[in-house]
Amino acid sequence: MSWVHPEMAAILASAPLAPDFQRLPLAEARATFGRLNATWNESTPALAEIRDLDIPTPWGAMAARLFRPSLAPRRPCIVFAHGGGWTFGSIETHRGTMARLALESDACVLGVDYRLAPECPFPAAVEDVCAALDAIIGGLAGDAVDPYRMALAGDSAGAAISLLTAVSTPWKPRLRAMALFYGCYLPVFDTASHGAYGIGFGLTTERMRWYWGNWRGPDTLPDLTELPPTYLNSPALDPLRDETLDLVRALADVGNDVTIDVYAGVIHGFMQMSAKLEPARAAHRAAGRFLSEKLK
């Protein structure tokens, strides 16, 4: 029997269960995902500025949102890719998470409304985050951002997008850090954590198979050499936990600076739940400390 944090248990007892998204019409599934996440944004912390931006791309303007913890000029900037199985989510569903990350790191956070699968499978989302990095380094936010102190971050599917962006972008030398929260990096479904937590702990193995079918991303890890210092975390009760632990080993094996935290008693997506869950707040603090130190 796996231990569940008391606050996590209370959330699970009171929160509406997520439906089988893969069995709903896509528009209905996306609207439902948005409603389920809206609760966690009701207590978004106040910041000095939250500004919407349009990022020009060859395929049209892309919405983005800049979170500034202070109005001090030339602050470091973290480009953030939201989770949602590459199929769901937006800069609105993850507003609270991005605001807290900005506060805890004392850095700007730029959230990106990348194109979603299945309409736009791999590599569309990676192209979009690369375009956001290009734009912010190119001065889109004016003097709010120091283009020489950049980082990438993301949760779940967004962690995979951020990792692939790091190995793809020509701005790799500008990246001081990465923060990857409970990511899905390979289409593997036979790990011990999938066996233990693939049913009954929120995210299911069946849904992950569906997400990967929408995304159609790479089935091998990219070249991981010479990446910036990387912070990773995982909930203990997550079917994706072993993917994170395997990535930690792969990063370390090629000489990267890697930090890992595993949070007991919580499930996939727990950082969205900061309003009611102390381990989520602790995870934001830990990630913020890491990013703040690396972005000095």
Q: What kind of feature is each model-predicted range?
A:
Residues 1-69, 296:
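A glycine/proline-hinged amphipathic helix-loop "lid/cap" segment
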Residues 60-62, 69-77, 225-227:
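Proline/glycine-enriched tight loop/beta-turn segments at coil->beta junctions
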Residues 92-111:
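Short amphipathic alpha-helix adjacent to the substrate-entry channel of hydrolases
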Residues 120-140, 287:
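Alpha/beta-hydrolase active-site loop
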Residues 137-152:
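Gly/Ser-rich "nucleophile elbow"/oxyanion-hole loop immediately N-terminal to the catalytic nucleophile
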Residues 167-216:
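Hydrolase active-site cap/lid region
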Residues 232-234:
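Short beta-strand/loop motif that positions the catalytic acidic residue
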Residues 277-296:
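Catalytic active-site module of serine/aspartate enzymes centered on a nucleophile-bearing elbow/loop
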